[in-house]
């Protein structure tokens, strides 16, 4: 796909999984992403400290890693303090060479709580498999999402040797659709919170009004008696 003349776009194959991450006496379960050097720019992530791994690191299967901004906190330290330190990832020693800037949760995953390693390192040293889970593609603005998906499907069908009329053995997702859905869900959730807050205020107001009415009613005889006595 990378070398294909029809689609010369920036791509990053990915291998994903969960492994234990240990540093000194602390241990956590963490989401591991094995990817290419282009993954960072495709995702729009930035390095806060240190550097991202290079293509040379990938080809050499180097045991280097980049961590999200919250990983250090989970290990009872700070992510920046881990730069230059060695950690145990699934029984394999890695050197932390960088930390990403905080991105926040996307609803499906949280980049701040992940660890990123070179694709071939992940394949050979961590997961022991050469089958990728997904391929992330950065589509130029000159293409519409529909045009891009048609072109990608055509290339993948050819590479997978899928004949005419045969079903695809892969799935193509337009991430912008998920982004739109997330925005809609966030808007609905915000509206629900505002609605719940409004109901709470209304119920609270009724409660205060009832208390005031009860207080006045209970003191009616007392007030009448005081007036009769000239108070």
Question: Which role does the model predict for each range below?
Answer:
Residues 20-23, 104-108, 174, 179-182:
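A short acidic, helix-capping loop that chelates divalent metal ions and anchors anionic groups
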């Amino acid at each position: 796909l990378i070398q294909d003349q029809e689609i010369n776009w920036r791509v990053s194959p990915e291998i994903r999984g969960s492994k234990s991450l240990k540093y000194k006496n602390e241990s956590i379960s963490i989401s591991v992403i094995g990817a290419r050097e282009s993954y960072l720019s495709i995702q729009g992530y930035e390095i806060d400290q240190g550097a991202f791994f290079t293509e040379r690191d990938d080809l050499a299967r180097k045991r280097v890693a980049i961590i999200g901004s919250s990983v250090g906190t989970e290990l009872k330290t700070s992510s920046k303090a881990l730069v230059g330190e060695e950690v145990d990832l699934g029984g394999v020693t890695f050197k932390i060479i960088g930390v990403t800037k905080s991105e926040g949760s996307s609803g499906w995953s949280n980049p701040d709580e992940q660890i990123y390693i070179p694709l071939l390192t992940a394949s050979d040293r961590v997961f022991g498999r050469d089958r990728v889970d997904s391929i992330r593609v950065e589509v130029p603005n000159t293409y519409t999402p529909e045009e891009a998906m048609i072109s990608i499907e055509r290339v993948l069908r050819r590479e997978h040797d899928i004949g005419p009329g045969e079903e695809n053995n892969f799935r193509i997702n337009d991430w912008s659709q998920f982004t739109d859905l997330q925005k809609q869900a966030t808007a609905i959730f915000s509206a629900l919170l505002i609605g719940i807050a409004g109901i709470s205020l209304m119920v609270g107001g009724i409660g205060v009004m009832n208390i005031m009415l009860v207080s006045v009613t209970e003191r009616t005889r007392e007030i009448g008696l005081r007036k009769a006595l000239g108070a």
